[in-house]
């Protein structure tokens, strides 16, 4: 076989921790990360329980332009990827010298679609949605954005 897949690092950003070490500790301590979300109750969901993931702060990592063009899912995935790269001891030079790709699982990106519809209904103008809305609404948005940010040249796939 001339090509192979190697998993070299791990990273996580979740409701039970924002690093491998935090998640491991939460699992040992039996912490769930599940909270009662009043907003979900007000929207009429049958269950107001949800995993509360802390808001990501990317000001030290990405430019303003990069930050406004990515959705919440990509923010979390970006921080998990940074941890995975550190875990694997991979630096920027490695990307220039090797064909690297990523594989991410993504359930949905419905928030971007809902936000766009809300803007159109309120303002009656599709121009206010912004050109980046289409990319935020794609299930492949995480992989697409991360492959651009990290200048990846390998196969990049989204499983959903």
Regions found by a protein language model. Give the residues of each.
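Short beta->alpha junction loops
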Residues: 158-160
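Conserved "HGTGT" condensation-loop signature of ketosynthase/thiolase-family condensing enzymes
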Residues: 1-155
């Amino acid at each position: 076989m001339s090509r192979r897949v190697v998993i070299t690092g791990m990273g996580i950003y979740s409701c039970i921790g924002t690093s491998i070490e935090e998640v491991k500790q939460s699992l040992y301590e039996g912490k769930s990360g599940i909270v009662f979300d009043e907003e979900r109750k007000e929207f009429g969901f049958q269950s107001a329980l949800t995993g509360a993931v802390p808001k990501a702060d990317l000001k030290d990592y990405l430019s303003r332009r990069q930050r406004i063009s990515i959705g919440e899912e990509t923010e979390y995935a970006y921080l998990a990827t940074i941890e995975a790269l550190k875990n694997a001891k991979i630096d920027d030079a490695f990307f220039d010298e090797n064909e690297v790709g990523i594989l991410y699982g993504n359930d949905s990106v419905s928030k971007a679609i809902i936000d766009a519809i809300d803007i159109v209904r309120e303002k009656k103008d599709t121009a206010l949605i912004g050109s980046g809305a289409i990319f935020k609404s794609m299930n492949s948005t995480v992989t697409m954005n991360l492959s651009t940010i990290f200048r990846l040249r390998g196969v990049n796939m989204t499983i959903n």
